[in-house]
């Protein structure tokens, strides 16, 4: 292929990838985090290639082959192959084995955060040579990168489990490297190719080669005289169609969830226009999307907990604002819950108080963390404020519903032809 035809091909690929990246960004309600960054990188690549096309930039054929498009295409193909992609090109911070702060880019975060993917576009031979110490100075081998991923993932638990790591190879990976990754607990996706042992070196040279190397494994001398056979594919591994995730079976109920669960709004009482604007808005939200089925679905087959301060304050609010049916539902709900003493985690106790962070929320969310439970809440303000201080809680966030049964007597029934402002 000539340089000109290769350039045209690269430009076409870049344009197609931009369309796919834009579609990926829209594939999730609220968008995929990092989608804009991915599109921006692709547009920068396209702009560069178009400058080459017009003669504004001179480039060698070898440089044209090694543009970032290969990697960005691998990122998009990985994201398109997985479910519940929440972010791409996400930067995680972690402490390395020496306690130094480091950052790590995860190409795709999928399955609601439970899966991390590194997409690799480089050829198997180049990756294998770097592993053997034959790369350029400063090149980090895939095995070393895998160690970084394991270190970082252990510090970024999702629902109290470390994310599962997949290394996706789009230009193959050598069998010894694939086996090493599997030993480390990392899944491999892509074509696995054989390695042929060269007979060029004498036994003495083999011995020296092995003794001077800092590569992994006891068979280094063999690896050092080996060559990747890209034509000999010994296995092809696709992305798993269903990645098993260890589901947390414990749920911690926040006050907002307790109120939402028993609210008249959540039990059919949403056909009202209340004097309070916020209640009318919540009624409209309930008519649009019922919250109780979502709560029941998440709580199903799980152990329910609530800390003492949450239950105490819930009952106090209920006594003041609750209607008869809401109080009856609350009594039934509390019977299903294991009430535990307030026991906030160390991380929660380190949070600085603010307009969004108070001692009650620290106790509730911190107790959930101590229990290794997912906290159900409508208090997204606290969750964001805590995250801004570097403390991310395992949460299930839902829309709020207030206690409204006692307000129905002063409310107006919804007319048949009523259209709310958010429907206009």
From Swiss-Prot:
Pfam families: DUF1308, DUF5614. It comes from the Eukaryota. PANTHER family: UNCHARACTERIZED DUF1308, UPF0415 PROTEIN C7ORF25. Belongs to the UPF0415 family. This is UPF0415 protein C7orf25 homolog.
